[in-house]
A protein has these predicted regions:
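Active-site recognition of the HExxH zinc-binding catalytic motif
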Residues: 1-15, 19-22, 26
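Post-HEXXH active-site segment of zinc metalloproteases
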Residues: 17-44
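Short, mixed-charge, low-aromatic patches
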Residues: 1-5, 53-54, 74-79
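Sec-exported extracytoplasmic/periplasmic mature domains
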Residues: 10, 14, 26-33, 51-58
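Acidic/histidine-rich catalytic neighborhood
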Residues: 42-67
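Pan-zinc metallopeptidase signature
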Residues: 70-131
Length: 131
């Protein structure tokens, strides 16, 4: 929830693109003195990065997944259960509306733009010399 709050606050500050809002949220959490806020940002980054990895290389995703600590696995499972509730016809319609809304507002990737924050994460860590 903390990373979502930071994401929405970044929109209020004028960053309308979803990938930018996610990345700003990650940075805000990453730079926080609050352990829970840092964890929330790390989880958001992990979810987006591993979702993208799964699309491109399910075997690499599985390798990484087996290395995650039990507490992280529990939190990921809870996150999946939460979002599973919205996999309904109404939820799918809302996703289509959100996709159309984003595209109408010059975010040509629509809902796919949320995950593009992974590109920004990679650039950030490259600039830091960490990858």
């Amino acid at each position: 929830i903390s990373s979502t709050m930071c994401h929405e606050l970044s929109h209020i500050c004028g960053f309308m693109r979803e990938d930018e809002a996610n990345f700003i949220s990650y940075l805000a959490c990453y730079n926080s003195d609050n352990t829970e806020l840092r964890y929330s940002g790390a989880m958001m980054g992990l979810i987006h990065a591993t979702n993208r990895l799964y699309r491109y290389d399910p075997n690499a995703w599985q390798e990484i997944y087996t290395l995650l600590p039990e507490g992280v696995l529990r939190d990921l499972a809870a996150n999946s259960r939460y979002w599973k509730k919205y996999e309904t016809p109404v939820g799918e319609t809302a996703d289509r509306w959100n996709d159309a809304y984003l595209k109408a507002n010059d975010q040509t990737d629509g809902v796919q733009s949320y995950g593009r924050m992974v590109d920004l994460l990679i650039a950030f860590y490259r600039a830091q010399g960490l990858i």
